[in-house]
Amino acid sequence: GCEWVSWC
């Protein structure tokens, strides 16, 4: 998931 990450 790209909700809590910054390196999607």
Swiss-Prot record:
One of its GO terms (molecular function) is ion channel regulator activity. Its main location: secreted. Disulfide bonds join C2-C8. The modification 6'-bromotryptophan is found at W7. Expressed by the venom duct. It is found in: Secreted. The keyword Secreted applies. The modification Cysteine amide is found at C8. It comes from the Eukaryota. GO terms for cellular component: extracellular region. Keywords: Amidation, Bromination, Disulfide bond, Ion channel impairing toxin, Secreted, Toxin. Belongs to the O2 superfamily. Contryphan family. The cysteine framework is C-C. Its target is unknown, but this toxin may modulate voltage-activated calcium channels (Cav) or calcium-dependent potassium channels (KCa). This is Contryphan Li1044/Li965. The lineage of its organism: Eukaryota, Metazoa, Spiralia, Lophotrochozoa, Mollusca.
